[in-house]
Structures are given as structure tokens and as C-alpha cells.
Amino acid sequence: MEIATILSGAGAVVAVTVTSVASFPSGKACAESPGARRTAMSEEQVVRNCAPTLAGLKTGNLFACPYENREDLLDFLRSLNRRLGKKGVRAVPLRIRQDRALIYLYRPARLEKDLSCASCEALLSEFGYNCRGGSRCLTRLARRLKQQEDFPHEIGLFLSYPPEDVKGFLEHKPCKCVGCWKVYENEE
């Protein structure tokens, strides 16, 4: 089953069961045994790491993907974008290192909306972002990821974290509760 058939309607995920794994053009498929080094990105890996975004519950997901051939990785992402673009989803490599890529799968329209709120714009401007468009902000984020070893903390805004929580984390405030992320303002 391909990702294109997993998605339906307004982006809802239906029965996320991957029964086949796509391989890169070179023919190298993802290693399927637990603990085996993955040699390529697969649709299964995308579904496992990005189900909340594919289901329309989040703006974006981020995951690391080992790879052996850069061109195969980029070909796979182009193919994925041809299929997912129809559903309003896009995948981009934010950082590519020697044998590992950091992939961001997101909903561009939702990212545009998320980053256009006043509190997001103010927070991002502190880090040199010009938030007149999600693609510009993504370009700046990718540049920051390449320039520094640590993750830029504003990345939470690209992953559907509330701006108040990202700001609270940056200011080292005491959190009110911990779940999938630390909550600093509204616990609900």
C-alpha cells in the first residue's frame, strides 16, 4: 500500500498499515529488520514518523533519515512530493550531512497560518526571521540548522508547538506540565 492510498479525504489517515516499502531508484530498499541500519528512506518510515501531519493533526514533523546516495534521497523526496502535494503535504530536507538527512514533512498552508500570528512573528524576528511567508522562514531555519550544531529552539513553532510554550522554554520558565512537550502557559 502506498502513502497515496493511505491518505483520503481532507488528509485523514485511514488504516495506517504499510504492506509494501518503496525503494530508491538504485534498488536499495530500507532494511526492515529491527536494529538494522537503514540504507534508504521508505514510505513506511515517512508514515511512522509523520502520521500526525499526514492525518492533519499537526503542521509538521521532523525526522532523521540515514542514506547512502544523496541523489537517491532527493529523487525519493521529489517522488514523494509529487504524490503528497495533491494532499497539501510537502517534504523537504532541512539539513543533509554525510550519511544522514533531517527531513521536514509539513502542510505549507498550515505553516503559513501558524507563523503569521503576531506572537510567532515576534519570536521569530528575535532570531532573524522575516516571516512574510512560510517558505522564507523554512529557508532561514535550514540556514540556522547548517550554521549550528544544536537545534534552534524556535523549531517548535514549525512543529505545532504553541508560541507561548516555545517562548517559555527559551526563557527557562518553570513548566506547568510535561507531555509530548513542556507546557508553560495553557495546560488544556
What do these predicted ranges mean?
Residues 130-135, 163, 178:
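Short, surface-exposed acidic
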Residues 1-31:
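Gram-positive cell-envelope targeting signals
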Residues 176-188:
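Accessory, usually C-terminal, subdomains that scaffold auxiliary metal cofactors
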Residues 58-60, 99-101, 152-154:
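Short, surface-exposed beta-edge/turn micro-motifs
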Residues 133-149:
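Helix-hairpin-helix/helix-loop-helix acidic hairpins
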Residues 151-176:
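Hydrophobic/aromatic-rich, well-ordered segments within soluble, folded domains that form packed cores
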Residues 27, 33-97:
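A structured, charge-rich N-terminal accessory region that forms the first stable segment of a protein
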